[in-house]
Amino acid sequence: LDEGVTPTTAQIHLIRYGPTTPTEVLSSGIRSVTAPVDFLKHLHIVDTPGTNAIIREHERLTTEFVPRADFVLFVTSADRPFTETERAFVEAIRAWGKKVVIVVNKIDIFERASELDEVLAFVGDAARSVLGTTPPIFPVSARLAGRAKHGEPALWAASRFEALEHFIHAA
């Protein structure tokens, strides 16, 4: 899948295990991608556009994917955490009775741990107000994880992705 500093997901992608990496169009706006990645033998990932785009196709997304999900990894950004559109989407997920796991990305923007702590407390409080309970929250840096996977392995620990990976594998 494409990645970048601006939104790159304009469609829903169903990502699952397969021997090659072709993309197949399943229906309008939904694509299937297979990849020879071992952990995909045990789970499928549904990658969606950001919440501003999702709200416009809210009914289709919820009726096709959320009811079948074991849990939803909801990604928010550390620089604009838990926006109003994100809050509305989490409320919709809650209506289906699905477990929500929150991922706070871009934690590498903070110079002090106290700044990250403040954002995590805000996200926890906001999620609790919508869900009635505080979901698991994983602070990560996708940028550092990507650099770690592409030649700078010393950055892996700073990305904090390991805890999220363990959670997903255990789920």
PLM features: residue spans?
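Conserved nucleotide-binding/hydrolysis micro-motifs of P-loop NTPases
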Residues: 8, 19-22, 50-52, 79-82, ...
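Conserved G1/Walker A P-loop phosphate-binding module
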Residues: 1-48, 53, 94-95
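Short glycine-/polar-rich loops that comprise or flank the Walker A/P-loop
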Residues: 8-12, 41-42, 67-72, 95-100, ...
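Residue-level signature of catalytic and energy-coupling elements of molecular machines
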Residues: 15, 47, 70-73, 141, ...
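Inter-motif core of Ras-like GTPase G domains
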Residues: 56-80, 89-103
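Helical mechanochemical/support elements of P-loop NTPase systems and associated helical scaffolds
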Residues: 11, 41, 58-68, 85, ...
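Canonical P-loop GTPase G-domain recognition
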Residues: 108-171
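Alpha-helix capping and helix-loop boundary segments enriched in small/acidic/polar residues
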Residues: 49, 53-56, 60, 77-84, ...
